Structure formats: C-alpha cells, structure tokens
C-alpha cells in the first residue's frame, strides 16, 4: 500500500518521514484497544515510557474514519484528565499512535478483585467529571463513557480514554443525532436518535456510577439488542442496596430521562456525594496495588489456560468488556450514508446493480452492521469462517434491496420474541 488513507490531511499526523521503529523501542503487549493492539514502549530520545497503539490499516479499512476521529480529538485536547497524545507515524501499512502510558489499569480492571468503597467511587467520579467538564467546555462529547474507558496512572491519576466515537458539537444548538456508544451505557435520546448534546455523557456517567458500585451496569444480564429497546421504554435505573443516600441521589440526578433536567459536569462536581467523599487521587494507589496483587494471583492460577493471552496492563481503550456482545456502536463513514441509513459497499452494489436504488432500513446502520463487525472479529479470533459471515451479511443487504424495510421488520419481530420469551420465564422480566 503506497499511500495510507490517513497519511495526509489528518490533524496530529507526523509529516516527517521518521521511522517509528528507530524513534521508539516496542516492549511487551499491554492491551487491545479500539482498532489495534497496545504496547508499552520507550521513547529513545527521552527514555520516557509511552504507550504505542499499532494499527494495520489494511486490516482496519472499515475503521479508518474512526481512527481519524480518535486522533483528531486527542490532538485537540490538552487536559490532565484526558489521555495525552504525542503523535502518529506511518510505516508501510502500520500506523503507530504514540500516547501517554497509564500503568494503573482501567476503572473496570480495578473492580475485578472486589467492590469499591464510596470514597474510591467518589474520587474516580470526580476525576471523570473534571474530564467531562473540560470536553464539554471545548464543545466535545465523549459518547462512550464507561469504566473500561477510564484509565489510571500508577500514581492514581484518572484520565478519559477511547475517543473513537467522540463528537464535535459545531452548530448553534450544540446537538448531534448520530447513534453511537455502547448499549448498556447509552442515553434514551441517543437510542431514539433524537437530537442530543453533552447531557448524553451525563447519563452514561450515571450508569458508570452504578457500574462502579455494583460491578456491572443495569440490564447486564440481557442481550444488548433487547437493552436498546428497554432503556427508552422503562423508568430510569436506580442504585439499589446499602449505599449512602448522597450516592443514590447522584445517580438519580444523572439518570433523568429529560436531558435538560440533568446537571452539567460542573454542577455535579459540587454535588454533596463528591464534596463529602472524594479524596486526593493518590488514595487510589491502594486500589491499584490490590488489583496488581489479584492479577498476579490469577496469572499463577490460570497460567496453563487460555487466559495467558489476556492483556494485563489495560492501556486498553475499552478492551476490558467482559460480555461477548458488549459492542460499541460507531458512526458510519458519511460517504456510505444516504438519508441517514447505511448504504452497501461497492462490492454489494455490484451484486445489486440490476436492482433499482431504494432506501435501506435504519437498523442496518444502528444494529446489524455493528453486530456483523463483532461477529467477524470474534470469528477471526477463533479461526472461524469469515466468508460465511460475509455471505450472510450480503444476503441481508440483497433482501433489503429487493424488499425495503424487511430488516427493520425482522429486528422488531426478534425483539418481540425476546420479550415474550423473557416474560414467559425464559429470562429476566422486561418490566
């Protein structure tokens, strides 16, 4: 590949033809982030420890727009509460993204050994709020706030990570109406594809607060496709159990279904739960040490199992999701969108050239496309048949072209059946 699609016109991209393998020493693999693998590394010029995300652009063709988005947003950010970005280098088909090294793990990792106390929860939430306050003041929204996307340094500093679906708010109303994020943490207005703003991040923060307290988000036992229908329909989740009234009120304030009634990040920094409980971030080093001890014990117990392949340091942009179907829905390339719905690739268009051009079901871009991307990724990881998955995806597009709207009908029927199955005792109740 002579020229990468991201080689020119990308903010933050190094224009010098420097060889990243000469500038940086790549050490052990420490994570699997969005789009690529993450390595610990050394900047040979300064001897500073860095994180190196390496992406094969030939394998990540479908994610080029998201990679560009992440680099663009990170290169525009300058905050102690956002993961620092040092630059990008292109070598052959490999893109090297150099970032701040954060060796304390993700907030999700820190939950693995056991629950957090309310002082730890408040301290982490305060730092997330500082990051959100900065982003929102810069007219940016993160759109994928969750514990897995919150990273810590070895000294307890807390930083926001994974900006692959972040959005720039540019119009006078400061609204977006794109459908991105991770289902369990998504605000109702995002799922309904209504216009939304930075208050969508506040809803996700409320879900993250429940996640930090309980170890998982609400509805985690359900299939994400079902959750996409439950969140707009049901009352907002509440934090149940023996937690303090201020923490429950903090969650309740974030999880108001009316976005305008949710507080801003700046207002939440003054909430009594934060003021009364949050401590200096150095307090979190005890939590990091606990996680490292637990991880060492686990590696001894599981050394002969496939868990030896699991990344350990978690400089991972959301790479710690435990569920097989906790996918992040990413915004599609505008060039492949028409009237807000996903259009087929050139290959699919060639297959369908004899059909008249018609609009496609909305669910193709919001549900089916991300689902097939996840299927392909998991099939590739276990040596499955990628061709069969691609054939099935192509068949759905062909059926859609022949009968517009059939995919929306199919998904609606699937959800109804899931709900009936759930209510008849086959799973958790939808009510």
Swiss-Prot record:
The modification Phosphoserine is found at residues 4, 308. Proteolytically processed by caspases during apoptosis. Proteolytic cleavage results in kinase activation, nuclear translocation of the truncated form (MST3/N) and the induction of apoptosis. Oxidative stress induces phosphorylation. Activated by autophosphorylation at Thr-178 and phosphorylation at this site is essential for its function. Manganese, magnesium and cobalt-dependent autophosphorylation is mainly on threonine residues while zinc-dependent autophosphorylation is on both serine and threonine residues. A motif (Bipartite nuclear localization signal) lies at residues 266-280. It comes from the Eukaryota. It is an enzyme of class 2 (transferase). A motif (Nuclear export signal (NES)) lies at residues 323-374. InterPro entries: Kinase-like_dom_sf, PDC10_dimerisation_sf, PDCD10_N, Prot_kinase_dom, Protein_kinase_ATP_BS, STE20/SPS1-PAK. Serine/threonine-protein kinase that acts on both serine and threonine residues and promotes apoptosis in response to stress stimuli and caspase activation. Mediates oxidative-stress-induced cell death by modulating phosphorylation of JNK1-JNK2 (MAPK8 and MAPK9), p38 (MAPK11, MAPK12, MAPK13 and MAPK14) during oxidative stress. Plays a role in a staurosporine-induced caspase-independent apoptotic pathway by regulating the nuclear translocation of AIFM1 and ENDOG and the DNase activity associated with ENDOG. Phosphorylates STK38L on 'Thr-442' and stimulates its kinase activity. This is Serine/threonine-protein kinase 24. The gene is Stk24.
């Amino acid at each position: 590949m002579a020229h990468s699609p991201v080689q020119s016109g990308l903010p933050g991209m190094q224009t010098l033809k420097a060889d990243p393998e000469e500038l940086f020493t790549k050490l052990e693999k420490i994570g699997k982030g969005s789009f690529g693998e993450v390595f610990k590394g050394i900047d040979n010029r300064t001897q500073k420890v860095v994180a190196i995300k390496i992406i094969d652009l030939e394998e990540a063709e479908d994610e080029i727009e998201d990679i560009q988005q992440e680099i663009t947003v990170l290169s525009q950010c300058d905050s102690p509460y956002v993961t620092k970005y040092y630059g990008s280098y292109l070598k052959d088909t490999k893109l090297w993204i150099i970032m701040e090294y954060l060796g304390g793990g993700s907030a999700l990792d820190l939950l693995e050994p056991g629950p957090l106390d309310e002082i730890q929860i408040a301290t982490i939430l305060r730092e997330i709020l500082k990051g959100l306050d900065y982003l929102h003041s810069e007219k940016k929204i993160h759109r994928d706030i969750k514990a897995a996307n919150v990273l810590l340094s070895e000294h307890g500093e807390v930083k926001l990570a994974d900006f692959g679906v972040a959005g720039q708010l540019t119009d006078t109303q400061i609204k977006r109406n794109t459908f991105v994020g991770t289902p369990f943490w998504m605000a109702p207005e995002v799922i309904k594809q209504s216009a939304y703003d930075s208050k969508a991040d506040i809803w996700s923060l409320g879900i993250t607060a429940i996640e930090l307290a309980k170890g998982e988000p609400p509805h985690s036992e359900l299939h994400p496709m079902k959750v996409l229908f439950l969140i707009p329909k049901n009352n907002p989740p509440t934090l149940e159990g023996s937690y303090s009234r201020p923490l429950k009120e903090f969650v309740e304030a974030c999880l108001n279904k009316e976005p305008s009634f949710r507080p801003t990040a700046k207002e939440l920094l003054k909430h009594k739960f934060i003021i009364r409980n949050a401590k200096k971030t150095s307090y979190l080093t005890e939590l990091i040490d606990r996680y490292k001890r637990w991880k060492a014990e686990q590696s001894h117990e599981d050394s002969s199992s496939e868990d030896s392949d699991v990344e350990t340091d978690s400089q991972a942009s959301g790479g710690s999701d435990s569920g097989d179907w906790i996918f992040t829905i990413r915004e599609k390339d505008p060039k492949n969108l028409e009237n807000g719905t996903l259009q087929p690739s050139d290959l699919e268009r060639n297959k369908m050239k004899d059909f008249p051009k018609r609009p496609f079901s909305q669910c193709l871009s919001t549900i089916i496309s991300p689902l097939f991307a996840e299927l392909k990724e998991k099939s590739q990881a276990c040596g499955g048949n990628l061709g069969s998955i691609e054939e099935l995806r192509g068949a759905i597009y062909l059926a859609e072209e022949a009968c517009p709207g059939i995919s929306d009908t199919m998904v609606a029927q699937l959800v109804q059946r899931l709900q009936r199955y759930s209510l008849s005792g086959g799973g958790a109740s939808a009510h």
